[in-house]
């Protein structure tokens, strides 16, 4: 568990602030994350790497010469929001375009993708590289659909070295994908991790057993095995990873490997060295040539007791870049050649939002929106622990926390907007952005998009009637479908949202409140029925069979909020 904290809500932000304070020669804090504290050459591509917090030294610990130019930092185990990614890129990019590098998770794909679209509209060349090294999460044929784990380190290290050596954007992107496709990882755990402020881990592993094939967000493994000796654990890791070794003698590969034995949080270095001793024996027995092995903590999962093995199958190019010098707060190797140490003098910051003039009718509607969002905030707070418990069965256990953070951020943004005399449209637009920023993750992106799209139905110059309220809800659900890409039967929020929308349209006559209340009952029934479905999307997809018997937390939270909305409007 986390022993030292001030507030669970502020833990991630305070950790970043302390990291920057400890490394002022390398890092500068900007809205949404960190960038290098020194100037970078004009026209050099920027490598912006990121993801949720809780994985230190990934990702902010890898910003510096020879590696990353910036890192957006999400909340614990939640992807940074699109606006956070956008802010970090605007501060890091210096005329050479940008590579966005992140692990292949649904929330990161959504938020980084939305930021990339906005940046491209502004004329910045953006490339996306999703790390997908975890062999437990998909088949070899679907390698790029796998999730990213400790392979983040070599992929970003190699891409950063290529940029440092003078690669342009096309070349850096090519090298990053090449490194990703040459990287394989496999992990296991002996106990789950505990979120800051929580008293119980997200999952337990029975004494004498280990969870095999786990992720890095507190997800349980794909199966449980008996815990053997250190040598037996080493053999399992080695056999799983080397099963996907490419043929020697093809494409420049001849048995050279970069090897990373990664502790996930509480496995001590001495234990790791015992395991690595056996791995080194196996490598020698099978004729591998080991290039700059690493043993330590590189991509962690808070205090998870676990270990993972990563191998990068090297050719001449990848070996040269893997062994190149690097200087970051958490990862240093060799002596960097002369680099510009000129302190960064300018930073980009978003201008304050201008509030359009609004009519009294629209401002009255905005005040009602605030009341609804405050109701949402209370419902999410009351159900945070239960939603987290349900999510931990096959996911990372952060859904309750994300919904609580998001609804609180949206309610505060709406109050601030109303205090500035905003109308209904502007209030919902700002609330949607705030929900996405505060929550991060997939649910943050989807609820943020839903509120933003709902706001598009309203006007700042006119009031709103009951029909507009129904139209706004339907627009929000359509945005969830469009952005998330899920369909009914995938075991997501959509399984409750689509039946709700259809029932709402059918039940609505002249009063929105009763129709929403009636449709919310349909949504709840649909959410409960997701317990019978095997998850096909999101982090729970990897543990699909484990999700059977437990309803989808996103579908449940949607039904809860629609019930609260109906009750509020019926009063």
Curated annotation (Swiss-Prot):
Pathway: Carbohydrate metabolism; L-threitol degradation. One of its GO terms (molecular function) is carbohydrate binding. Keywords: ATP-binding, Carbohydrate metabolism, Kinase, Nucleotide-binding, Transferase. Disruption phenotype: Cells lacking this gene are totally unable to grow on L-threitol. GO terms for cellular component: cytosol. PROSITE patterns: DHAK, DHAL. Residues 7-331 form the DhaK domain. Induction: Slightly up-regulated during growth on L-threitol relative to growth on glycerol. SMART domains: Dak2. ATP binds at residues 396-402, 442-443, 484, 539, 552-554. Residues 367-567 form the DhaL domain. The keyword Nucleotide-binding applies. SUPFAM superfamilies: DAK1/DegV-like, DhaL-like. The active site is at 217 (tele-hemiaminal-histidine intermediate). The keyword Kinase applies. One of its GO terms (biological process) is carbohydrate utilization. It is an enzyme of class 2 (transferase). It catalyses: L-erythrulose + ATP = L-erythrulose 1-phosphate + ADP + H(+). Its EC number is 2.7.1.209. PANTHER family: TRIOKINASE/FMN CYCLASE, TRIOKINASE_FMN CYCLASE. Kinase that has a preference for L-erythrulose, producing L-erythrulose-1P. Involved in the degradation pathway of L-threitol, that allows M.smegmatis to grow on this compound as the sole carbon source. Is also able to phosphorylate D-erythrulose and dihydroxyacetone in vitro. This is L-erythrulose 1-kinase. It comes from Mycolicibacterium smegmatis (strain ATCC 700084 / mc(2)155). The gene is lerK.
């Amino acid at each position: 568990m986390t022993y030292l904290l001030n507030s669970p809500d502020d833990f991630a932000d305070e950790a970043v602030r302390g990291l920057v304070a400890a490394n002022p020669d390398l890092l500068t804090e900007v809205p949404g994350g960190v960038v290098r504290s020194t100037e970078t050459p004009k026209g050099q591509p920027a490598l912006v790497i990121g993801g949720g917090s809780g994985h230190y030294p990934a990702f902010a610990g890898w910003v510096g010469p020879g590696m990353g130019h910036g890192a957006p930092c999400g909340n614990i185990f939640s992807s940074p929001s699109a606006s956070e990614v956008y802010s970090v890129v605007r501060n890091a990019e210096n005329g050479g375009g940008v590579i966005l590098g992140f692990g292949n998770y649904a929330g990161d794909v959504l938020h980084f993708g939305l930021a990339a679209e906005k940046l491209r509209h502004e004329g910045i060349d953006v490339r996306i590289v999703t790390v997908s090294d975890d062999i437990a999460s998909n088949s070899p044929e679907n390698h790029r659909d796998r999730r990213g784990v400790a392979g983040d380190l070599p992929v970003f290290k190699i891409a950063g070295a290529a940029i440092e050596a003078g690669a342009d954007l096309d070349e850096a992107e090519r090298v990053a994908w090449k490194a990703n496709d040459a990287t394989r990882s496999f992990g296991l755990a002996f106990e789950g991790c505990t979120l800051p402020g929580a008293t119980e881990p997200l999952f337990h592993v029975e004494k004498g057993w280990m969870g095999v094939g786990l992720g890095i967000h507190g997800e349980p493994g794909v199966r449980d095995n008996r815990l053997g000796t250190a040598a037996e654990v080493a053999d399992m890791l080695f056999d799983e990873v080397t099963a996907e070794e490419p043929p020697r003698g093809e494409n420049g590969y001849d048995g050279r490997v970069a090897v990373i034995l990664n502790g996930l949080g509480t496995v001590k270095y001495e234990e790791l060295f015992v395991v690595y001793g056996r791995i080194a024996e196996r490598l020698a027995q099978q004729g591998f040539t080991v290039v700059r092995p690493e043993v330590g903590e590189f991509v962690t999962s808070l205090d998870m007791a676990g270990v993972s093995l990563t191998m990068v199958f090297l050719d001449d190019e990848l070996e040269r870049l893997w062994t190149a010098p690097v200087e970051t707060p958490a990862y240093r190797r060799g002596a960097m050649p002369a680099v510009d140490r000129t302190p960064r003098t300018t930073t980009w910051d978003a201008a304050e939002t201008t509030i359009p003039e609004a009519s009294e009718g629209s401002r009255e509607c905005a005040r009602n929106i605030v009341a609804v969002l405050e109701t949402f905030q209370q419902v999410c707070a009351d159900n945070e622990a239960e939603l987290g418990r349900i999510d931990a069965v096959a996911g990372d256990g952060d859904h309750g926390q994300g919904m609580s953070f998001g609804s609180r951020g949206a309610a505060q943004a709406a109050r601030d907007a109303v205090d500035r005399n905003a109308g209904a449209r502007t209030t919902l637009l700002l609330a949607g952005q705030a929900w996405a920023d505060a929550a991060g993750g997939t649910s943050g992106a989807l609820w943020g998009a839903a509120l933003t799209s709902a706001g598009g139905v309203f006007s700042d110059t006119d009031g709103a009637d009951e029909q507009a309220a129904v139209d706004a809800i339907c627009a929000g659900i359509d945005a969830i479908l469009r952005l998330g890409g899920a369909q009914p039967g995938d075991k997501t929020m959509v399984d409750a949202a689509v039946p709700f929308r259809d029932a709402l349209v059918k039940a609505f006559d002249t009063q929105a409140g009763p129709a929403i209340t009636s449709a919310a009952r349909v949504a709840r029934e649909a959410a409960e029925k997701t317990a019978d479905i095997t998850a096909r999307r999101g982090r729970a997809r990897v543990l699909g069979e484990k999700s059977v018997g437990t309803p989808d937390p996103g579908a449940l939270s949607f039904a809860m909020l629609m019930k609260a909305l109906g009750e509020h409007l019926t009063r």
